[in-house]
Structure formats: C-alpha cells, structure tokens
C-alpha cells in the first residue's frame, strides 16, 4: 500500500538490450512492489523477492502472478487491511471500491506512460489502470474502475498510415540492394551498344515506373561468343570474362524455358 513517490530502483532495466534474470536480478534494488518498472523487472525475472506476498510465482505478460490479482489504490483511499482476492468472485462490486480499494492506479512519469487521466482531462496526472470491473466507468472520478482495454492510452487520435508517394518509391528502389530506374536504363542502353546498335530508341512510361523499353538496330552477340557468354556463370570466378550483353543475357538465358539462340542480323529489342 506504499506511496510511490520515490523513483524505481529498476530504472536502468530499459537500457539493457538483453533483459533477463541476470540483468534484472531479484527485487533487491527497490521495495516499491507496484512500480511499473519494478513490475517489468519481476516479469523478466519471476517474483523471487521476500517482500512480495507470493514469492516465487511466475509473472504473466501483464506483470502479475497468474494466481493472484493485485489491485489497490495508493493514497488516502487505500485500505491498509488490503488482502489480495484469490478469485475474480472475491473482487468487490464497484460501489465498494472506495472502501475496499481492490483496484490500483499507478502514477508514473510522462516519459514512461504518455497519457492523461481520462477522468481528470488533459491536466490530470498520467495513470495506469488495471482490473476487471468495468461497472463504474461512467461514474465520477471517485471510481477506480479500469479502462475498457489494456493501456497505455493516448489522448490524441491515431494517425493514419500515409501511402508512399512515387518519388519515395523511386528513392527506395535507388538503394544499394535494388537497382534504380536510371541504372536499369543505363544498363539496357549499354547492352544495345554492346550488341552493335547504331540507332537506339528509348521509351519510358510514367518516368520508368511502369515501362522501360530500349530498342536498337544491333545484331546481338556474335555467334562465336554466345556459348561462352551463356556458360560463364558456371565457370570459376577466375575464368569468367565480361562479354557482350554483360549479365542481362545470362539472366534471361538462365530463367527462360528454352535456351536463347543466335538470331540473324536485324533490329533487336531489349
């Protein structure tokens, strides 16, 4: 039933990238059993401190032992004779919450829980509410019933996810992993030049986002170089040579259902 005016002894647990029993230890840093960070520490390490009424109980994802319900109200309304209810049926109805105090409100700093007391408005202190009885949530703030769902809560409306604009898509595609559109055009033009083209036509649709077409009058790879070019991916790295259409033709050859064959002289398209 303590007043949580002092800082949590586990304020450093959020700095650890590998939070666990060795990083947290037993509850020896802090005696505030209901501090938010203390609950986090107990969840990570189990509850092994002698100051807790249920030592050794594993904690659930909410930070409480699965066999007990911790609900109290720190402050003047707290009952000093508070006993943990063993079952949900033992939790008193909402009219008795003022005297029995079976719900707790945890004051925390704004950086730990950036939300306001829904009853007090924007000027209220940040709170964390837990419990199961929703019967008095429409009553004045003397009621400590929990909010309808798990917290923490924020007062401002959720921001809608904005679609990525086409310029950003192009910038993403220009990263080191995916070739940019300009690089793709450059490679196709170089392929046409390597194929002996003297006249090259370039067509782009929506700045290359939907279509990139490069056509020229080149004759393609010379027949004597074709077989060596297609087999180069299967050769040792020290034996590979950069021939003809660089790796573009190699990729098409490996992914096609029937191997490409040399074509007679005439206009070619890439």
Curated annotation (Swiss-Prot):
Keywords: Kinase, Transferase. The keyword Protein biosynthesis does not apply. Pfam families: HATPase_c_3. GO terms for molecular function: kinase activity. InterPro entries: HATPase_C_sf (IPR036890), Uroplakin-3 (IPR024831), Znf_RING/FYVE/PHD (IPR013083). Gene3D superfamilies: Histidine kinase-like ATPase, C-terminal domain, Zinc/RING finger domain, C3HC4 (zinc finger). Encoded by one of the numerous copies of postmeiotic segregation increased 2-like genes scattered in the q11-q22 region of the chromosome 7. Belongs to the DNA mismatch repair MutL/HexB family. This is Putative postmeiotic segregation increased 2-like protein 11. It comes from Homo sapiens. The gene is PMS2P11.
């Amino acid at each position: 039933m303590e007043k949580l005016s002092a800082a949590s002894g586990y304020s450093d647990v959020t700095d650890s990238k590998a939070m666990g029993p060795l990083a947290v230890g037993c509850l020896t840093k802090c005696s505030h059993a209901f501090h938010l960070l203390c609950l986090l520490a107990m969840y990570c390490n189990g509850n092994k401190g002698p100051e807790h009424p249920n030592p050794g109980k594993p904690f659930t994802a909410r930070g409480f032992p699965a066999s007990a319900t911790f609900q109290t109200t720190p402050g003047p309304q707290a009952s000093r004779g508070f006993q943990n209810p063993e079952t949900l049926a033992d939790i008193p109805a909402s009219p008795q919450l003022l005297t029995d105090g079976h719900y707790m409100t945890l004051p925390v700093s704004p950086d730990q829980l950036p939300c306001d007391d829904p009853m007090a408005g924007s000027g209220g202190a940040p709170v964390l509410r837990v419990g199961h009885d929703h019967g008095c949530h429409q009553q004045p703030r003397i009621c400590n019933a929990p909010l309808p769902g798990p917290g923490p809560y924020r007062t401002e409306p959720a921001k809608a996810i904005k679609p990525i604009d086409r310029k950003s898509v192009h910038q993403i595609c220009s990263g080191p992993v995916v070739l940019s559109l300009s690089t793709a055009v450059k490679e196709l033009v170089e392929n046409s030049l390597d194929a002996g083209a003297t006249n090259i036509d370039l067509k782009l649709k929506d700045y290359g986002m939907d279509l990139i077409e490069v056509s020229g009058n080149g004759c393609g790879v010379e027949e004597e170089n074709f077989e060596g070019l297609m087999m180069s991916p299967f050769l040792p790295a020290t034996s590979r040579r950069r021939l003809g259409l660089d790796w573009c033709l190699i990729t098409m050859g490996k992914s096609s259902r029937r191997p490409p064959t040399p074509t007679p002289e005439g206009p070619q398209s890439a």
